[in-house]
Amino acid sequence: MSDNSQKKVIVGMSGGVDSSVSAWLLQQQGYQVEGLFMKNWEEDDGEDYCTAASDLADAQAVCDKLGIELHTVNFAAEYWDNVFEHFLAEYKAGRTPNPDILCNKEIKFKAFLEFAAEDLGADYIATGHYVRRADVDGKSRLLRGLDGNKDQSYFLYTLGHDQVAQSLFPVGELEKPEVRRIAEELDLVTAKKKDSTGICFIGERKFREFLGRYLPAQPGKIVTVDGDTIGEHQGLMYHTLGQRKGLGIGGTKDGGEEPWYVVDKDVENNILIVAQGHDHPRLMSVGLIAQQLHWVDREPVTAPFTCSVKTRYRQADIPCTVRPLDDDRIEVVFDEPVAAVTPGQSAVFYLGEVCLGGGIIEQRLPLPV
C-alpha cells in the first residue's frame, strides 16, 4: 500500500453512488484522495430539471463523510463549445449523435484531466466508470468492466492509452450490487440514489421539448417504403432508426396491426420513411462505413482483421471484419445482418475483453434488395 501513499488522485464526484464508492476504494488502496465536482451546464430553466445543486450537495456530503476535500470547477463554456454545438449540428444534419462519448473525450478526460494535473497537482484522475485498465508492454489498455450489464467502455473508446494511463477506474473491478452494498455499509447518502439515465447535460428532462428550444422543428410527411403517405412527423431530429414509439400511426389494412418502425430519413425532402416489422429488410444492414477513428492501443488499420463491434450501448457483440478504406475511414462487414445501424452513433470494436477503439458511423451498408 505504501507505494500509493505519495500519489494524489482527484476523483470526479458526480453526486452518484459509483464515484462515491470509487473515492472510498482509493482511500483503502492508500492514495491521497480529493474530489472534484464539475458543473458543465448553466441551468436557465428554473429548478424543474436542475439536479446540479442536489448532486453537488450529495458529493459534498460523501466527501465530508470520507474526510476528503471537494473542489468545484465550471466547464460550462468548454461544454457548450466542444460538445453541445456539435450535438446540435449533428441533429440538424439528420444524424443521431452520442454526446456522452464527446463529453468524456472533451470534458472528463481532457478539461478535467488537465485541471486536475495542472491546478490540483494530481498524479491520476479517477471516475466511477465501469471499465478496467491493464498495463501491457508499457501501454495502458482499456478493458470492459467486470459487470457485463454495466460495462461502459463503449463511451470511452476515444481515450488514448496515455489518458488511460493517467486514469483509475476502481468500480470497474466490481459488480454494481457490490458497489451499492459498500455504499450502504458506509451509510453514504448516495447508496440508494438511482443511476442517472439522461444525456449527460440534459438530465431527465423531456428530450423533445429541450431540443425544440435550440432547433426549430420542421414538420413533414411520414411515408411508407412503398411510397404511401400515412402521417406527419414533427421534425426528423426527434426520430432515430429502429424507433417504434411516438410515431402516431397505427397498423394498415394490408400489414395488419404490426407496428411501424423508422427505417430511413430523407433529410433533403424532410421525409420520415417507415416500414412494418422490427426485422424489415430496409432496417437491416450488412455493415457500415466508420470515420473519425480513435484507436486506444493500436496503430491505424492497414490490413483487414476480425473482431467484434457494438453499434450502440448494451448491444450484444457482433462478429465482423474490418477493412481500411483510407487514412480515416474503415469498412466494417458483419457476419450476420444487423438492425437499426444509425449514422452519427459510434461503432466500438473489441478483441475479447480489450476495447480497441472505434469511430463514428458515417453510413450503413443496407441489405441488398
From Swiss-Prot:
Active-site residues (renumbered): 103, 200
InterPro entries linked: MnmA-like (IPR004506), MnmA-like_C (IPR046885), MnmA-like_central (IPR046884), MnmA-like_central_sf (IPR023382), Rossmann-like_a/b/a_fold (IPR014729)
GO molecular function, one term: tRNA binding
Keyword RNA-binding: yes
Species for this entry: Cronobacter sakazakii (strain ATCC BAA-894) (Enterobacter sakazakii)
UniProt-annotated binding residues for ATP: 12-19, 38, 128
UniProt keyword list: ATP-binding, Cytoplasm, Disulfide bond, Nucleotide-binding, RNA-binding, Transferase, tRNA processing, tRNA-binding
Assigned EC number: 2.8.1.13
Compartmental location: Cytoplasm
Main location: cytoplasm
Catalytic activity: S-sulfanyl-L-cysteinyl-[protein] + uridine(34) in tRNA + AH2 + ATP = 2-thiouridine(34) in tRNA + L-cysteinyl-[protein] + A + AMP + diphosphate + H(+)
NCBIfam families registered for this protein in UniProt: PRK00143.1, trmU
GO cellular component: cytoplasm
Region feature (Interaction with target base in tRNA): 98-100
Function text: Catalyzes the 2-thiolation of uridine at the wobble position (U34) of tRNA(Lys), tRNA(Glu) and tRNA(Gln), leading to the formation of s(2)U34, the first step of tRNA-mnm(5)s(2)U34 synthesis. Sulfur is provided by IscS, via a sulfur-relay system. Binds ATP and its substrate tRNAs.
Disulfide feature: 103-200
Site label Interaction with tRNA, positions: 129, 345
The protein, known as: tRNA-specific 2-thiouridylase MnmA
Entry-linked SUPFAM superfamilies: Adenine nucleotide alpha hydrolases-like
Domain of life: Bacteria
GO annotation, biological process: tRNA wobble position uridine thiolation
Subunit structure and binding partners: Interacts with TusE.
Region (Interaction with tRNA): 150-152, 312-313
